Regions:
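Sterically constrained small-residue positions within well-ordered secondary structures
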Residues: 45, 159-161, 248
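Short beta-strand scaffold segments in enzyme catalytic cores
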Residues: 2-8, 13-17, 162-174, 178-182, ...
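A mid-sequence, solvent-exposed acidic-amphipathic segment
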Residues: 151-202
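Flexible, glycine/charged-enriched surface loops at secondary-structure junctions
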Residues: 227-234, 243-260
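Short Gly/Pro-enriched loop/turn and capping motifs at secondary-structure junctions
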Residues: 242, 263-266
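Extended charged low-complexity segments that act as oligomerization/scaffolding linkers
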Residues: 233, 269-270
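Conserved short S/T/G-enriched processing/targeting/catalytic segments and their helical context
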Residues: 1-154, 189-235, 276-370
Length: 370
């Protein structure tokens, strides 16, 4: 996958968004948004008031394995009878995820060394390896040198030559500290705390960083601490992702976003998964606003409706096109036409869908109705 970005909206609310596009042999493209995982079982999340969401960049199977292993470890951890609820925080649970992350890395390293040399990292440290014929010392310097390169990450463990580094962003909420976010990187093997509003990893991470930096530099310290709010935060998060989609390679596929809200009363409201058509329409709304076809407040209102449980996507899309002065121009933009000059497209669905409605409401400019 290409990029993952997290953003804190308020003290108790935030989101994580992925935009994933992969390509093979420089030509074939695949779009997928699978590498965003909710890690806590719903019943345990309700009991302890926590949520944890994991999103990664780099080698896709790595993150799938981490998520499955982390879910198992977290389920066992939260099922302990002697567990103090006061000790259940996003940071504590993050270290459980880190353990799963490290175990997957260690397995991949050991698998490659077992395949190449017949010994694992423990045997490399001991200087001896054991097989069915007995125990033998590891003596060849070229073998030890290459094995150490694999352990240190200087040689890949089965990734493609164009795969970005394996990195992940982890966001969570708990009853004690509210929203927290962390970073995990395969080359470091530590859990890094997100000390500012945002984190961006992967291809094109500079784009969201620039957009968020401009936003934060305009705000006073108290305003930063208070947060920007959930509804506006969703807009700015997707605006930052759009910056990467517009200007950086390997970005531009479908997006998927998970919103976690510590102030929500129900499990449905506490974790919101925005995907497929709703996510696509959100990106189109942001694109219209970035091209000055839609004002920001209207864009925020439309996206707020799209991020509610079971949104009426068709109704929101209809409101979206009616909110712009020139729906035909908007249609050209969304179909990737050049829109330097205004005017109606000769072909396309916009005249049929929106011009008739405009005639009925008297909104068509003179000459356009004909």
């Amino acid at each position: 996958m290409a990029i993952v970005t997290s953003f804190r909206f308020t003290k108790n609310c935030g989101a994580i968004c992925v935009d994933q596009e992969s390509w093979h042999v420089w030509r074939r493209k695949n779009w997928f948004t699978d590498h965003l995982y909710s890690l806590i079982d719903p019943d345990q999340a309700t009991r302890f008031g926590v949520e944890l969401v994991y999103g990664g960049v780099g080698h896709p199977p790595y993150h799938l394995e981490v998520a499955e292993k982390a879910r198992k470890l977290l389920r066992e951890h939260l099922s302990r009878k002697d567990l103090d609820p006061a000790a259940v925080t996003a940071e504590k649970l993050g270290h459980v995820v880190l353990k799963a992350f490290q175990q997957v890395h260690r397995r991949r390293v050991d698998d490659k060394m077992e395949y190449l040399f017949g010994f694992n990292s423990d045997e490399l440290n001991a200087g001896t390896f054991t097989n069915c014929q007995g125990t033998f010392p590891i003596q060849r310097e070229e073998v030890k040198s290459r094995a150490l390169k694999i352990v240190h990450g200087e040689e890949d463990t089965g990734y493609g030559p164009l795969t970005p580094p394996v990195e992940a962003c982890l966001i969570g909420i708990d009853r004690h500290y509210g929203f927290s976010a962390f970073c995990l990187k395969e080359k470091d093997g530590v859990l890094g705390f997100q000390s500012c509003w945002f984190e961006s990893l992967g291809q094109g991470r500079q784009g969201p960083a620039i957009r968020f930096a401009k936003l934060l530099n305009q705000r006073f310290l108290d305003s930063r601490r208070q947060g920007i709010g959930r509804d506006r935060g969703v807009f700015y998060l997707l605006d930052a992702i759009s910056e990467a989609m517009d200007h950086y390679g390997q970005d531009g596929g479908f997006v998927r976003m998970m919103i976690i809200d510590g102030d929500a009363e129900s499990a449905t409201d506490r974790l919101r998964d925005i995907r497929d058509n709703a996510a696509r329409l959100c990106v189109e709304i942001v694109k219209a606003q970035r091209n000055e076809l839609l004002d920001r407040e209207t864009a925020v209102d439309l996206m707020t409706d799209l991020t509610r449980p079971e949104p009426d996507i068709d109704a929101v899309e209809s409101r979206f096109f009616k909110a712009v002065d020139d729906p035909m121009r908007l249609g050209k933009l969304l179909r990737r036409y050049k829109i330097e000059e205004p005017g109606l497209p000769e072909q396309g669905p916009e005249p049929r869908l929106f011009q008739a409605d405009a005639v009925q409401t008297g909104a068509v400019r003179e000459g356009d109705a004909s």
